[in-house]
Amino acid sequence: MSTGANKRGVVVAHPLGNQFVRHLTHALVAKGMLAEYCTCIDWRPGPLAECLWPGGVRAEMQRRSYPEIPASLVASRPFREFMRLVAGRVGLSALTRHETGALSVDAICRDFDRWVARRLPGEVGGGIVYAYEDAAAATFAVGQRLG
């Protein structure tokens, strides 16, 4: 959970992370403007964890690693996304079916969006919110209400 140190800064929300988000958050951290980065998985393994995971799982988790962002500025909601990754690996395709599966990317994004929206009033206050398409409707609605 974030400390919300910069309550007037920028909240960046992206459930899965991507290269642009990495560059954006890195720049905001460098300028002292990142209030919080919200994502599903923030992988911060120790050396033992790196050795124990099979190569494919380790590579997937490393994509969810944000070492350039202080842990105090990251809020994560890992359970559903982690379960989606597991379901995909063990062949439970009904759970991950596009748009309709309980663990589909669409369902993960909707859940993530509602979670970020609930965090805004208490954690961030009147800062700026930067979020993405399918995971932003509720977040933007709350952000607009907060001003």
Please give the residue ranges for each predicted region:
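N-terminal subdomain of nucleotide-sugar transferases
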Residues: M1-L73, A117-G125
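Phenylalanine-focused residue identity feature
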Residues: F20, Y37, Y66, F79-F82, ...
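Conserved nucleotide-sugar donor-binding subdomain of glycosyltransferases
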Residues: R77-I128
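An aromatic- and histidine-rich active-site surface loop
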Residues: N18-R22, W43-G46, C51, V105-A117, ...
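Short, solvent-exposed beta-strand-terminating loops
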Residues: W43-R44, A71-R84, G147
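Residue-identity detector for threonine
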Residues: T3, T25, T39, T96, ...
